[in-house]
């Protein structure tokens, strides 16, 4: 999601309000979203960026680790969301045990 946040700063300006939302889905997986005040929705995958291009890679970079993603217009705002691949449902995540405490000698 750093790409989505960087996009807000680069194209809307530093200090532009953006919302980052983490949602736990009924499946236990996580959805991550960034909403910003730009209502324009970019082409979903505009094609590969050139080696020397300084922009145009954001959605392609998002597509690699998150095969489930999208961009939608919400009135005068845009929302980019993704669901990272391979993420275990929360009920499968194990909490590590507390470290052992030794008494001093």
Curated annotation (Swiss-Prot):
Region (Disordered): 29-55, 72-105
Record field: compositional bias (Basic and acidic residues): 72-81
Molecular functions (GO terms): sigma factor antagonist activity
Recorded superkingdom: Bacteria
Membrane-spanning segments: none
Xref: CDD domains: HATPase_RsbW-like (cd16936)
Residue pairs linked by disulfide bridges in the UniProt entry: none
GO biological-process terms attached to the record: negative regulation of DNA-templated transcription
PANTHER family tied to this protein: ANTI-SIGMA-F FACTOR RSBW, ANTI-SIGMA-F FACTOR RSBW-RELATED
Protein name: Uncharacterized protein SCO4941
Provenance organism: Streptomyces coelicolor (strain ATCC BAA-471 / A3(2) / M145)
């Amino acid at each position: 999601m750093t790409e989505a946040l960087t996009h807000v700063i680069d194209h809307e300006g530093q200090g532009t309000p953006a919302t980052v939302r983490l949602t736990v889905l009924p499946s236990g997986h996580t959805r991550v979203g960034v909403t910003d005040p730009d209502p324009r929705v970019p082409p979903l995958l505009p094609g590969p960026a050139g080696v020397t291009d300084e922009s145009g890679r954001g959605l392609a970079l998002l597509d690699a680790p998150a095969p489930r993603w999208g961009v939608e217009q919400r009135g005068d705002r845009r929302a980019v969301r993704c669901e990272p691949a391979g993420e275990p449902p929360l009920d499968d995540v194990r909490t590590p045990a507390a470290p052992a405490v030794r008494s001093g000698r």
